[in-house]
């Protein structure tokens, strides 16, 4: 993922989210308004505009307490990348009721330059009926556009959400100098072997998926909600880039860690990516997955790695976001978001092959 969540490992609370009846996304159910309450502090007001209570999933949405992508931050028209990501529960919201959530964008974005920024929020919140954890739909939202004038020095003083230590920066720099993908010091024999196997499988899946995208319009429509020629070329190019990046364990544009030293591996997280550094980290439960599943739309190490590579801008730009997880939610996305959603690529590769 900008975190991949291990849905199957969540138990009764949210396990039903893995498979639920196909329901289109609702574009009018939820309203999100942003206001500035400090130099880099933002308050988001999320309102249920419907006439029935909603049980709204917090994980990897604007309501998540962890450092996921809550908003998009722009300066002079350029997107400021998220430095990291992350965990999960539900919030029940009565009809016309609102919930407020405040967060500091300087904890997850580098705003040290200061000046004028534009902040927006958009995405999808999986929803269930009141007193239920069975996902039945998802509410798309797009907030107002918030203009902020930020003091760079104050922003730089905000504690970062993840511990990217000087030692880690040094390791990362050495890895880039040598064009090393897997950082050997982060692996033991078992995790190194598993990661190398996942890379090989990811390469084969991505190559096969790229061919299928060109040759199977029915399946392309199923997973990406369009057969537009430009969208198809974008998907094929991204899959080919993932295949190239996965094809070697000692050369490439990303740095790959077998283990986490930055504190991003929260409960239920399989792996995560830092797009600003083109860095991928496997979490302990990644190694509980099978190397390559035979079950359609199930999680495995290969498609988790494929998913993570789509988040890296050095692999393909613009890099993918996490708008939705799981087959039913992903195929409910509109085409523009499906083509930019990481899990659509992993599911397409797995579902075809």
From Swiss-Prot:
Keywords: Cleavage on pair of basic residues, Disulfide bond, Hydrolase, Metal-binding, Metalloprotease, Protease, Secreted, Signal, Virulence, Zinc, Zymogen. Its main location: secreted. Residues 1-19 form the signal peptide. It is an enzyme of class 3 (hydrolase). Residues 20-179 form a propeptide. Zn(2+) binds at residues 307, 311, 322. Disulfide bonds join 187-258, 265-283. It holds the Pfam family Peptidase_M35. Binds 1 zinc ion per subunit. The lineage of its organism: Eukaryota, Fungi, Dikarya, Ascomycota, Pezizomycotina. Coiled coil: none annotated. SUPFAM superfamilies: Metalloproteases ('zincins'), catalytic domain (SSF55486). GO terms for molecular function: metal ion binding; metalloendopeptidase activity. This is Probable neutral protease 2 homolog MCYG_07155. The active site is at 308. Its cofactor is Zn(2+). One of its GO terms (cellular component) is extracellular region. Belongs to the peptidase M35 family. It catalyses: Preferential cleavage of bonds with hydrophobic residues in P1'. Also 3-Asn-|-Gln-4 and 8-Gly-|-Ser-9 bonds in insulin B chain. Its EC number is 3.4.24.39.
